């Protein structure tokens, strides 16, 4: 769990993914379309993959990936991110991390 907490607070927006996950890719594209360059951790390339998955689930993710953190706080998985986006609540949350040059 410590590793996940450390990794999730490295940058403003952090997404834990797996390289074969299409929903992970969709969430990454959403953030890029919103002018945010998230830090991506592909956990299937990490030797601690299983432990990271377990930690993400313990933190409250409905699925281990994608797991989105903003400002070091868990936002959630695909359902939570898309719900925030559709309700208009995602952009204010990520505003400090948007790039004007992106």
From Swiss-Prot:
Keywords: Cytoplasm, Disulfide bond, Electron transport, Redox-active center, Transport. One of its GO terms (biological process) is cellular response to nitrogen starvation. Transmembrane segments: none annotated. One of its GO terms (cellular component) is nucleus. Residues 1-101 form the Glutaredoxin domain. The keyword Cytoplasm applies. It comes from the Eukaryota. It is found in: Cytoplasm. The keyword Electron transport applies. Disulfide bonds join 21-24. Has a glutathione-disulfide oxidoreductase activity in the presence of NADPH and glutathione reductase. Reduces low molecular weight disulfides and proteins. Belongs to the glutaredoxin family. CC-type subfamily. PANTHER family: GLUTAREDOXIN. This is Glutaredoxin-C13. It comes from Arabidopsis thaliana (Mouse-ear cress).
